[in-house]
Amino acid sequence: MEGGIRAAFSGLNDVRIDPTGGEGRVLVPGEVELIVYVGEFGEEDRKVIVDALSALGGPQTVQALSVLLSYVLQGNTQEDLETKCKVLTDMGFKVTQAVRATSIEAGIMMPMRELALTVNDDNLMEIVKGTLMTCSLLTKYSVDKMIKYITKKLGELADTQGVGELQHFTADKAAIRKLAGCVRPGQKITKALYAFILTEIADPTTQSRVPSMGALRLNGTGMTMIGLFTQAANNLGIAPAKLLEDLCMESLVESARRIIQLMRQVSEAKSIQERYAIMMSRMLGESYYKSYGLNDNSKISYILSQISGKYAVDSLEGLEGIKVTEKFREFAELVAEVLVDKYERIGEDSTEVSDVIREAARQHARRTSAKPEPKARNFRSSTGRGREQETGESDDDDYPEDSD
């Protein structure tokens, strides 16, 4: 019987289990076709734009988005459109022009009517841009998280960005659900949103606004893992390559390779918009950087979180629970302690320290031997909230957090 079982299972050593279904695609702009909506606007077309703004979240959401995207990319001149298309083609993307909707039916559901009523000739462009950036967040937030963001954060944030009118952005659940259904990764309209955000980042006059309001930190693109890794290396005061050398372990090899690959790609980007193109790539499709999330690389992510937790617990509160076994948690905490001790040596036997430093080291040694060092924070909860440090952004407790 035993021989029969062995025969039945022979060859399984050559079968690789890949629960993620593949690593996913790496962003290669030349393989991506972006959409730019076009259609001339005249003075009499202002009503079409306002109607499109009103219609967001209703039955004509896609048509409305096409009008708004055409307006912000094209403006009132053909030269504006050509300049922005050149930004995208210079990055290597293929650009295809699509005809926008020509009208929006009056009288149908208008969920954003309250926002549209705040429009005038002076603020129209800024309101439309802010609205589109807000819509792009639906590629990273669930409907419930988006409603929380709108009700607790958007008004204050928009006011600091000079678009206080966005406090009237609807939080109606049916409208947000409709928007979320239209703005999904890989959709034609989502690729047009992606193109719009990249052109805004490339423009020095709007560049600073986009990180605050746009979908620049998407789940699963690996940027949280990169942020953890960079933060840990910085805290230890060592080069990234040295940290990877210290973490040499068979089960971490694949994760280390992903870190190196993504860091290299980001570092080789020639412009800020090229870096953000990588960070936002999940807007183009769920397959991008599919295995770069924290829980796809849970072991190295947990070790890195423990290292930085030795320095500042609150710097890691934005991370949701990283799934590792209790046994590995204990091991990771020990690895973090050993690494910190290695690079935070406070010795009194060196010939290149002053008497003051030597005496302080003696007292430090006595104190630490008298009481156990507290462990780094153990991230077991899946509801942790706080802030991340991957892009230099900071969020308060009312801001819906996300992790890769």
Swiss-Prot record:
According to the record, the residues making up region (Disordered) are: 358-404
Q: Name one Pfam family in it.
A: Rhabdo_ncap_2
Tell me if NAD is a UniProt keyword of this record: no
Its biological purpose: Encapsidates the genome, protecting it from nucleases. If expressed without protein P it binds non-specifically RNA and therefore can bind it's own mRNA. Interaction with protein P abolishes any non-specific RNA binding, and prevents phosphorylation. The soluble N-P complex encapsidates specifically the genomic RNA, with protein N protecting the genome like a pearl necklace. The encapsidated genomic RNA is termed the nucleocapsid (NC) and serves as template for viral transcription and replication. Protein N binds protein P in the NC through a different interaction, and can be phosphorylated.
Q: What is the lineage of its organism?
A: Viruses, Riboviria, Orthornavirae, Negarnaviricota, Haploviricotina
- What is the source species? Viral hemorrhagic septicemia virus (strain 07-71)
A GO cellular component annotation in the UniProt record = helical viral capsid
Q: How does it assemble?
A: Homomultimerizes to form the nucleocapsid. Binds to viral genomic RNA.
Which residues constitute the signal peptide according to the record?
Answer: none
Protein name per the record = Nucleoprotein
